[in-house]
Structures are given as structure tokens and as C-alpha cells.
Amino acid sequence: MKIVVLAGGLSPERNVSLSSGAMVSEALREQGHQVALVDLFFGTEGVEGPAEALYDAPVPQAFKRIGRQAPDLAQVRAARRDRSPSSIGPGVLELCAGADVVYLALHG
């Protein structure tokens, strides 16, 4: 199955969500599924080529190494290139529409 795992987002528990999403993605891949791990807030920003490439992309190391402190959400917002006020990043809805299942690894 093609599964999109949504993690991160804009929550004080963002880092925990990224870590959960990484673990869920790896477990699903071990079971033979095609998995695209996507940060809900940043979406497909920075993805080279079509968003479908995320199904073959390794789990980012940054998703596995989380800090103990809550993230500075103002810094997270400022880091998004398109500066959109939306909580949903570019390409997320389109990627989800093409998946068989969307798994929410969101917290908070």
C-alpha cells in the first residue's frame, strides 16, 4: 500500500511527532509498504523532483534526533519559505490524495 505518514506540524509536541513519524514509517516499510514521511507544516518544500519521490526517500536523520526542549514555533514558522499562514505545507493535500492511507503521527 502507498501510505503517507504526517508528522511534525505546529505544536509544542512537534519534535515528539517527528520521532513518532520516523518510527511508524520505518515499521511500515519493514512490512513492505511504500511510505512517504511528510512534515505537515513544511510539506514537500525542498523535495527535488516530484513529491512521489518521498516514497523512496530515506527517513531524515533530523526526524530521528529530537531535542528535549519544546521547539520555538516562531522559528519553525519563519523557516518555511513560502511564509504562508496555513498550518498545512505545500503539496501535502495532493500527496495525501494519491495515497491509499494517510497515517497521522501528530501530537498535541
PLM regions: where:
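ATP-binding N-terminal substructure of ATP-dependent carboxylate-amine bond-forming enzymes
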Residues: 1-108
